[in-house]
């Protein structure tokens, strides 16, 4: 919705539209997180990253793969809005059905000719898709066990990790929790 409004305002000529993902500067900015991760935790086996338009996974994945090529990048997508996940599997931009998702920061399609698809395809080792129920469970785990209140898009990464937790229990796993734009009423209804 915000992206639509931004595009509309840009069409008036008074504003410039900057994509939240389809821009080299945005991708590079997201990549700085990769440098921070490597500085603080240099021996990570797997990194779970929520996927929307692909800016975050492209930026972080590029830095990680360059400096730590054995680290696996696992993209996590909401089943209700999985255009990037489907496009990575297909190898080209494809449109998918979009339904409401708690991971609304990751919702929506990707632009034809997007910069992120070839980058994300190259740096992503695997993709996990999550249901809304799995995202709800991840939000609850973060609130009750970690005392963290994050948006659904951040909890999406944990929901993906939870699917592989047992098989990766002897590895060094990092779940990227990036995003605190939560609707308090929505979170409260999940917790009740």
Residue ranges and their predicted role:
Residues 1-192:
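PLP-dependent amino-acid enzyme catalytic core
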């Amino acid at each position: 919705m915000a992206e639509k409004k931004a595009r509309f305002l840009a069409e008036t000529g008074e504003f410039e539209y900057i994509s939240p993902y389809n821009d080299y500067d945005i991708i590079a900015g997201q990549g700085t997180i990769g440098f921070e991760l490597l500085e603080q935790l240099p021996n990570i086996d797997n990194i779970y990253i929520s996927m929307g338009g692909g800016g975050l996974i492209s930026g972080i994945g590029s830095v990680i793969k360059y400096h730590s090529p054995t680290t696996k990048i696992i993209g996590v997508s909401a089943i209700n809005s999985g255009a990037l996940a489907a496009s990575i599997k297909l190898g080209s931009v494809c449109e998918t059905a979009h339904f409401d998702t708690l991971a609304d920061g990751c919702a929506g399609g990707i632009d034809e000719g997007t910069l992120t698809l070839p980058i994300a395809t190259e740096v992503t080792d695997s993709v996990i898709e999550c249901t809304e129920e799995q995202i709800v469970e991840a939000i609850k785990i973060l609130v009750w066990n970690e005392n963290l209140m994050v948006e659904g898009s951040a909890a999406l990464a944990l929901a993906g990790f939870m699917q592989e937790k047992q098989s990766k229990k002897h590895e060094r796993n990092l779940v990227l929790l990036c995003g605190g734009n939560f609707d308090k009423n929505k979170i409260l209804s999940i917790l009740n």
